[in-house]
From Swiss-Prot:
Family that this chain belongs to: Belongs to the purine/pyrimidine phosphoribosyltransferase family.
Compartment(s) of residence: Cytoplasm
Keyword Acyltransferase: no
Primary gene name: apt
Assembly, per entry: Homodimer.
GO MF annotation terms: adenine phosphoribosyltransferase activity
Top-level class of the enzyme under EC nomenclature: transferase
Protein name in UniProt: Adenine phosphoribosyltransferase
Main location: cytoplasm
Pfam families, per the entry: Pribosyltran (PF00156)
Reactions catalysed: AMP + diphosphate = 5-phospho-alpha-D-ribose 1-diphosphate + adenine
Job description of the protein: Catalyzes a salvage reaction resulting in the formation of AMP, that is energically less costly than de novo synthesis.
Taxonomic lineage from the root: Bacteria, Pseudomonadati, Pseudomonadota, Gammaproteobacteria, Pasteurellales
Keywords: Cytoplasm, Glycosyltransferase, Purine salvage, Transferase
Pathway(s) of this molecule: Purine metabolism; AMP biosynthesis via salvage pathway; AMP from adenine: step 1/1
Amino acid sequence: MNKQLDLIKSSIKSIPNYPKEGIIFRDITSLTEIPEAFTATVNLIAEAFRHKGITKIIGTESRGFIFGAPVAVALGLPFILVRKPGKLPREVISQSYQLEYGEDKLEIHADAIQKGDNVLVIDDLLATGGTVEACIKLVNRLGGDVKHAAFVINLPDLGGGERLRKQGVEPFTLVDFAGH
């Protein structure tokens, strides 16, 4: 597995001072351009959750879709989209969450999760955990449960893993990068 993780990590380009000065952007689009790295990413996440009793997978807009959908296909599970406001056609419920400077909102179809669903949340990157926390609240409001969340990249210095663990959610990450 170390060869696969090395391939994944080396496939992620680091872009300094993007989107603003002092930030190092971890670009997963470079990973998706390398089929072996993309396949390894999907397979490692899928295998980590194959026997965890997951009933549905949620992907967060938009990069969570890139990894969540193929993992759902690999596991033969429904894939649920969590989107920004106004993007879903049926009845939705919304959840606000805090950003570094302001607030944002996520939505899910009101009929997407049923009572007792064991939901895995997938996103590309774990930073502060705010986006995933909003997803957890959406799932809980619909009667589902989130015990696991999966990410390609972890930025441990930003505390997202600890934030999720305090809510009883165990984060699974493939590669760590220092900083923010």
